[in-house]
């Protein structure tokens, strides 16, 4: 068993986020079942004044 930086390379193989059905971005978290960009599957779209991509 190896501890430290070398063992962190094992985390790079898995895909945490997949493409979202609503916004199309690669932001849908597979385990949390929620899009970090638009908030899918919430009914209201995720929108904050400090986010610049939709202004």
Swiss-Prot record:
Cofactor names: Zn(2+)
A GO MF label:
rRNA binding
Alphabetical list of Pfam families matching this protein: Ribosomal_L37e (PF01907)
Q: Which residues bind Zn(2+)?
A: 20, 23, 35, 38
Q: Which GO terms describe its cellular component?
A: cytosolic large ribosomal subunit
Keywords from UniProt, A to Z, are: Metal-binding, Ribonucleoprotein, Ribosomal protein, RNA-binding, rRNA-binding, Zinc, Zinc-finger
Q: Give positions of the C4-type zinc fingers.
A: 20-38
Cofactor binding mode and count: Binds 1 zinc ion per subunit.
One of the protein's GO biological processes:
translation
**Which SUPFAM superfamilies does this entry report, sorted A to Z?**
Zn-binding ribosomal proteins
Question: The organism sits in which domain of life?
Answer: Archaea
Zinc-finger keyword on record: yes
Q: What does this protein do?
A: Binds to the 23S rRNA.
Q: Which family does it belong to?
A: Belongs to the eukaryotic ribosomal protein eL37 family.
* Annotated protein name in UniProt: Large ribosomal subunit protein eL37
Species this chain originates from: Cenarchaeum symbiosum (strain A)
Tell me what gene encodes this.
Answer: rpl37e
